[in-house]
Amino acid sequence: RSSIKDINKLSNNVMARQVLLTLSLEKTAIGNTKNGARIIRDWLQKNNLDMPELIIENGSGLSRIERVSAGHLNKILLLGVNSPYRNYFIESLPIAGVDGTMKHRLVDKLRKYFPNKKQSEDLKKNLELFPPSLKNYGAHIKTGSLVDVRSISGYVISRSGQVYAVTSFINHPNAGLGKIFHDTMLSWLLDDGPMN
């Protein structure tokens, strides 16, 4: 469990690859990427997640070959909220303005609205059904980047307590500007953009 936190918070690609190989080794007695990818596909199928575009090359995402759609990754986020391991998973994601790869992002935005003792009744009511890690205003976001690629995926808890699953991939020569777009989109969600 602590390994997953290290992988996600710090975007540790070497450790992510080792998890795939370990999964393969434990389930098949042969630690290789092919078996690890098959185990993941079997798990997805068991959870009614058909992802024909999915390509797993090394398990870390640090690849020009690996593929998954934003919509399918968002479905995994929705599945994650209902998982018995949800707290471990959600707490493993970097928290905007607090830690990991999101430590220096959205800091001013979040300072402006961090809940205090006057937290609204709406916020409390909307969050009753969610795990403790999704009961505080903010963003739990895994980031990813390659040359010409920027991505985010995770959960945003808005000012009113609405929880949004969000995934965005930018594949473009100007993807470096994607950080600005992603932060703007996350800010919009923090402000309950879809509800306005």
Regions found by a protein language model. Give the residues of each.
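A conserved catalytic-loop motif detector
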Residues: 66-133
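Short, well-ordered beta-strand elements
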Residues: 6, 17-21, 153, 162-172
